[in-house]
């Protein structure tokens, strides 16, 4: 795919966002020539691939081992101690405005994105008492980064004077994959230490984001950190504005998309884990589940790291020894905890819907769900209570009960009015299924295309040479996986959008080039 200047339906406000056109081809498959495609994994990546393939007329079967779609953003029904039926999920996720391809997927069933609601700010608070806000920060780079520095109490003039400006220059011109070639061998912590960011700013502005990768910044590749800075600060004028679903994930996002897929003729098989994928002579593969085997002309593997490792290990006919070793080398991030607590009284009206935290013994953020989610708001209105969610990423030690208790104690510390609140009920989600991007891992990440022309990969663990991350990487690789299969059959794929793939201006690019002129 190549960037084009031709007009396309805009996906955001940034006039420098780039559009990537797919290979030319027919609009869809002709009747009678539709290939059969198995998409294995019903998370964001799998849903993106399945949706595009079904729209182009392919005969799609979507396999998902869980009983609902959404992958790591799925939800399940549960009954509380007060008899209320509610949805439990992994909770707060920010749908940033520069997640163009993810938002494009959601527009299939919600053209105006009316089921997303904006949050006014992304406040960050350190245990030392300092708080940062992005509400008044300009959105256009480089004024966004400069505005954050000027407005932030964590940056003093002495701190700015002590910073190593030359070491920070690579932030001004982030390119993919070059950023990995230069910085994948360096940890995020080492890079920040080299820049000499103030320690409080280090914690608030960077550690909070690096832990969004569910990783300790001492282990995370600095390339991922630079990419984050590009996506949110210096590469995009969308800024740190984001939306959240106004109902639980299943109702707002995945059930409508599942219905859409079925209307397109796709066979959606939830509660159906795949055991093996074995190549067939002449192309395609046989997909085996507990109920038997089915032959397909093409396959998309859109799985989390553990499931991908397991399926490839059980399917000895896939790939080369080196490719299989690379799959086996994909690491999973440390466990994380989402605690959702239903309280008998509201939190203070001044509390934000979301608060990022640092220095609070492992507590990474607090969400007040009844500020933005309809189901939680209705429960709070009916009971007079509130629904609060606590996240802890990269949990490496401690008994689960102790960690859960510790998060509640930190909530009491940060929001003292909760100390006297009665806990009506609580749910705790412990998971360890997100990819880890440690130092030096980029070269071994699997690509979308494989040596089998009928097999593609998708997911946020898959290498993507575009400036995307997290949910947007999942959606983008899902579309790329489908595009590759469609292009091989002469059918046009999905138009993709991305934040600029280099520094936004000649000045920024020239300054960034100084970092290599040593």
Residues covered by each model-derived region:
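Glycine-rich FAD pyrophosphate-binding loop
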Residues: 54-79
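N-terminal Rossmann-like FAD-binding beta1-loop-alpha1 element of flavoenzymes
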Residues: 33-62
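Mobile amphipathic helical/loop "lid" adjacent to a hydrophobic cofactor/ligand pocket
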Residues: 8-10, 102-103, 107-108, 113-222, ...
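Helical element adjacent to the flavin cofactor pocket in flavoenzyme catalytic cores
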Residues: 228-290, 294, 298
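FAD-binding beta-loop-beta segment adjacent to the flavin cofactor pocket
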Residues: 376-382, 431-465
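Mid-domain catalytic core of redox enzymes
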Residues: 2, 6-17, 33, 272-388, ...
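Active-site-proximal substrate-binding core of FAD-dependent oxidoreductases
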Residues: 484-518
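Extreme N-terminal leader/targeting segments of oxidoreductases
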Residues: 1-37, 55, 507-518
């Amino acid at each position: 795919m190549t960037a084009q200047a031709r007009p396309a339906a805009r996906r955001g406000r940034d006039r420098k966002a780039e559009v990537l056109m797919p290979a030319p081809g027919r609009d869809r498959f002709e009747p009678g020539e539709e290939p059969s495609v198995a998409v294995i994994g019903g998370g964001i990546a799998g849903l993106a691939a399945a949706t595009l393939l079904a729209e182009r007329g392919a005969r799609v079967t979507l396999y998902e081992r869980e009983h609902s779609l959404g992958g790591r953003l799925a939800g399940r029904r549960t009954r509380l101690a007060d008899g209320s039926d509610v949805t439990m999920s992994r909770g707060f996720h920010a749908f940033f405005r520069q997640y163009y391809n993810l938002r494009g997927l959601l527009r299939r069933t919600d053209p105006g994105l009316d089921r997303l609601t904006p949050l006014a700010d992304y406040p960050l608070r350190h245990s030392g008492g300092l708080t940062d806000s992005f509400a008044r920060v300009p959105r256009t780079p480089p004024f966004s980064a400069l505005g954050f520095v000027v407005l932030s109490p964590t940056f003093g003039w002495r701190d700015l004077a002590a910073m190593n400006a030359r070491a920070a220059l690579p932030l001004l011109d982030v390119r993919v994959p070059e950023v990995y070639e230069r910085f994948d061998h360096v940890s995020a912590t080492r890079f920040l230490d080299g820049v000499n960011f103030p320690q409080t700013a280090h914690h608030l502005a960077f550690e909070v984001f690096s832990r969004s990768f569910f990783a300790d910044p001492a282990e995370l590749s600095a390339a991922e950190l630079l990419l984050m800075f590009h996506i949110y600060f210096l590469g995009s004028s969308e800024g740190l504005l984001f939306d959240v679903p106004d109902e639980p994930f299943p109702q707002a996002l995945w059930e409508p998309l599942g219905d859409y897929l079925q209307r397109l003729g796709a066979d959606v098989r939830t509660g159906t884990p795949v055991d093996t994928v074995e190549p067939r002579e002449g192309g395609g593969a046989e997909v085996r589940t507990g109920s038997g085997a089915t032959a397909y002309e093409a396959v998309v593997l859109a799985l989390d790291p553990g499931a991908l490792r397991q399926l490839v290990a059980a399917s000895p006919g896939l790939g080369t020894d080196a490719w299989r070793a690379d799959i086996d080398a994909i690491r999973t991030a440390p466990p994380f905890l989402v605690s959702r607590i239903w309280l008998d009284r509201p939190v203070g009206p001044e509390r934000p819907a979301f608060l990022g935290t640092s220095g609070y013994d492992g507590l990474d953020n607090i969400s007040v769900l009844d500020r933005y989610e309809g189901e939680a708001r209705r429960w709070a209105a009916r009971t007079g209570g509130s629904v609060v969610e606590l996240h802890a990423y990269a949990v490496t030690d401690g008994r689960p009960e102790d960690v859960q208790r510790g998060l509640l104690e930190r909530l009491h510390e940060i929001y003292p009015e909760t100390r006297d609140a009665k806990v009506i009920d609580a749910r705790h989600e412990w998971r360890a299924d997100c990819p880890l991007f440690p130092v030096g891992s980029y070269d071994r990440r699997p690509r979308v295309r494989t040596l089998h022309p009928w097999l593609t990969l998708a997911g946020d663990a898959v290498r993507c040479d575009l400036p995307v991350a997290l949910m947007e990487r999942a959606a983008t690789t899902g579309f790329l996986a489908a595009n590759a299969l469609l292009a091989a059959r002469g059918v046009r794929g999905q138009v993709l959008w991305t934040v600029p793939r280099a520094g936004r201006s000649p000045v920024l690019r020239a300054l960034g080039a100084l970092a290599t002129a040593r």
